[in-house]
Structures are given as structure tokens and as C-alpha cells.
Swiss-Prot record:
Enzyme nomenclature, EC number: 4.2.3.4
Pfam family name, one: DHQS_C
Class of enzymatic activity (EC top level): lyase
Principal localisation: cytoplasm
Family: Belongs to the sugar phosphate cyclases superfamily. Dehydroquinate synthase family.
Protein's name according to its UniProt entry: 3-dehydroquinate synthase
Free-text remark on how the cofactor is bound: Binds 1 divalent metal cation per subunit. Can use either Co(2+) or Zn(2+).
Task of the protein: Catalyzes the conversion of 3-deoxy-D-arabino-heptulosonate 7-phosphate (DAHP) to dehydroquinate (DHQ).
Reactions this protein catalyses: 7-phospho-2-dehydro-3-deoxy-D-arabino-heptonate = 3-dehydroquinate + phosphate
Pathway: Metabolic intermediate biosynthesis; chorismate biosynthesis; chorismate from D-erythrose 4-phosphate and phosphoenolpyruvate: step 2/7
Binding site for Zn(2+): E184, H247, H264
Length: 359
């Protein structure tokens, strides 16, 4: 087992990475102070790992209940969030009840938001079961739900007590979900660590075939990088925005097609292709680097052409992005691997990118 710590100055929490961790009671025990635990999961993950988690919690002597939600990005909304509150109130959960998020990014985001809201804040633990959630969404305290007009527009910054990333859970991940997670690994290397990006290029085939050592390294290094960024800028006042590379275009794709049509990581992968194209057009990035990024995204079996939503629709959706200010779209662009720039772009350049990178 590898442990990466997220140090926020006045508080910290561990990210435990390894195989078989869902069944290890000693990893959960230090973070559960009250007499009850509510596991929040979905209809896909609960049959796979729900019993193992509940068996691990049993020796702790806590009352354990489970809320099982429908699976998918389409359910990341108020109605589904209320199902969590219904479960908590039905169990008479109190302020010391610990929520455990067992699932991917949707479950983690909604459980964290529920924990932030219920009785104005209860503790929660992340148990991410997808590669995307292990390398990205479970770390850093971003929680929330979608709105029809924009992704993750309603939420809170609320940190978990711990993240328990069981690499073994990735063996049951569908191929599309695996590729979606690799997209966030690629993003992390591209924005923050050129040497890690080189490693990803050399090992993308190993990641595709779920080589345990490659997956463990990808999760570890991604978590180390994200932990350092979050420690420097917990609430996304500046530096942390670089983690949104590919997300301005990507969120527009998700909202424009309807949540769940493309996986989040698929949209981010394509969004990185689009952002790199815009970076070249603005004279920030050399074309050889753009080609390298495009190639590794394609090698991870991710889409490299965006849907034809139309220029006006893309612009409308990107203006709803959380980074936008007074309606001005802000992009995270590449100068070189490991070096980014947060900037606006002329509409003409954006239109040229859309013409070149969408169907």
C-alpha cells in the first residue's frame, strides 16, 4: 500500500492506494467517530463491492445503512441528491454519522455534497472505484451536482476524512470507463509534469491492458500532483484552475449532448485536443507537442473529434463555465508540457479550433 497525504495546513488527510483495500477495516476505523455509517453507492457498484465494504465495517461495531442510487451522470441532480437525504433522515443520522462514498465520480461528488449539506456538515470517506475518481475527482474536496445549463454548477468545497483507492476495483471497470480515467492521467502529466507525460506516452498500452504496476504508478503520481496543487490553492482561487485543462470544451460537450451521452473523461480527452489546437493557434504551443498529445489521447481509445454542436451553441455553453467572468470565456492552454496559461481567446481563434476539431 502507498499513502499520499493531502496537507491543507490546518488539517490533512490520507490517500491510501493499493489492492484489496476495500476490505481493510483498519483503514476506515480512525476516520469513523460516531455510532453510525451510511454507505452511498449505485446499482452497478453495490453488487460488486458493497458486501466487502459492509463486511469491513462490521467489526467496528457501528450501525451501517446503505443508500443505493441509479448509476450514471444523468442522475447527478437534485432529485437523486434528495434520495441521499431521504436515507439519512430515515435512519435518523446525526452530526457524527459518517458517509462513505463507494463508486465513481458521480457518487463521490454527490455524497460529498450531501455530507457538506446534511446538518450543515458531517464527515465522509471517499472509496473511489473508477480510475477517473481515483486519480482526480475523489481528491481535493470538490463536490456537487449538475444543472441543465452547466456541469457541477451547484456544489461546495468539502474535504473527505480519507480516500481509500482500491486498485483491485479497476479490474471490473468497463473499457470506456478505463479510457475516461486515463484521460485525467494524461491531463495531469500535460499540465504539471513533463516527465510524467513522457512516462504516460511510454506506458499507455500497459494502462490500457490494466497492468497493476502501471495503474498503481498512474494513480500515485496523479494524486501527488493534485495534492500539491490543492494544498497551494484549495478553493480554486488561481493555480488550481489548471486542473481544468480540457474541461472548458469538455463541459460544453457534456452539456450540449446531454449528461451521460459521453463520459466525463471522454469529453475531457477531446477537450484537451481542442485546447491544444487553440494553444497552437495563439502561438503558445509548438505543433509537435500538439501532435504528441493528440497521439496519446487516441492511443488511450478516447475521442479526438468533438460533436458538431455549432459555434453558437459551444460559445453559449462555455460562457456558463465556472471559470468565466462577466461572460468572458477563460481557457486553460498549454505553453509546453508542464506549463500552462489561463487566458481568454479571440472568438475567431476559437471558431477556427471548432472548425478543425469537430465533426
Amino acid at each position: 500500500m502507498i499513502t499520499v497525504n493531502v496537507d491543507l495546513g490546518d488539517r490533512a488527510y490520507p490517500i491510501h492506494i493499493g489492492a484489496g483495500l476495500i476490505g481493510r477495516a483498519e483503514l476506515f476505523a480512525p476516520h469513523i467517530k460516531g455510532s453510525s455509517v451510511t454507505v452511498v453507492t449505485n446499482t452497478t457498484v453495490d453488487p460488486l463491492y458493497g458486501d466487502a465494504l459492509r463486511a469491513a465495517l462490521a467489526p467496528l461495531g457501528k450501525h451501517v445503512s446503505t443508500v443505493v442510487l441509479p448509476d450514471g451522470e444523468a442522475y447527478k441532480n437534485w432529485e437523486t441528491l434528495n434520495l441521499i437525504f431521504d436515507g439519512l433522515l430515515g435512519e435518523r443520522a446525526d452530526r457524527k454519522t459518517t458517509l462513505v462514498a463507494l463508486g465513481g465520480g458521480v457518487i463521490g461528488d454527490m455524497t460529498g455534497f450531501a455530507a457538506a449539506c446534511y446538518m450543515r456538515g458531517v464527515p465522509f470517506i471517499q472509496v473511489p472505484t473508477t480510475l477517473l475518481s481515483q486519480v482526480d475527482s475523489s481528491v481535493g474536496g470538490k463536490t456537487g451536482i449538475n444543472h441543465p445549463l452547466g456541469k457541477n454548477m451547484i456544489g461546495a468545497f468539502y474535504q473527505p476524512q480519507a480516500v481509500i483507492a482500491d486498485i483491485g476495483a479497476l479490474t471490473t471497470l468497463p473499457e470506456r470507463e478505463l479510457a475516461a480515467g486515463i484521460a485525467e492521467v494524461i491531463k495531469t502529466g500535460a499540465i504539471a509534469d513533463a516527465a510524467f507525460f513522457d512516462w504516460i506516452e511510454a506506458n499507455v498500452d500497459a494502462l490500457n491492458r490494466r497492468d497493476p504496476a502501471a495503474l498503481a504508478h498512474a494513480v500515485k503520481r496523479s494524486c501527488e500532483i493534485k495534492a500539491s496543487v490543492v494544498a497551494a490553492d484549495e478553493r480554486e482561487g488561481g493555480l488550481r484552475a489548471i486542473l481544468n485543462f480540457g474541461h472548458t470544451f469538455g463541459h460544453a460537450i457534456e452539456a450540449g449532448l446531454g449528461y451521460g451521452e459521453w463520459l466525463h473523461g471522454e469529453a475531457v480527452g477531446c477537450g484537451m485536443v481542442m485546447a491544444a489546437d487553440l494553444s497552437v493557434r495563439l502561438g503558445l504551443l509548438d505543433d509537435a507537442s500538439r501532435q504528441r498529445l493528440d497521439a496519446v489521447i487516441a492511443a488511450a481509445h478516447l475521442p479526438t473529434r468533438g460533436p458538431a454542436l455549432g459555434d453558437a451553441r459551444y460559445m453559449e455553453l462555455m460562457r456558463v463555465d465556472k471559470k468565466a467572468e462577466a461572460g468572458a470565456i477563460k481557457f486553460i492552454l498549454l505553453k509546453r508540457f508542464g506549463d500552462t496559461l489561463i487566458t481568454q481567446a479571440p472568438d475567431e481563434a476559437v471558431f477556427a479550433t471548432l472548425a478543425h476539431t469537430t465533426r
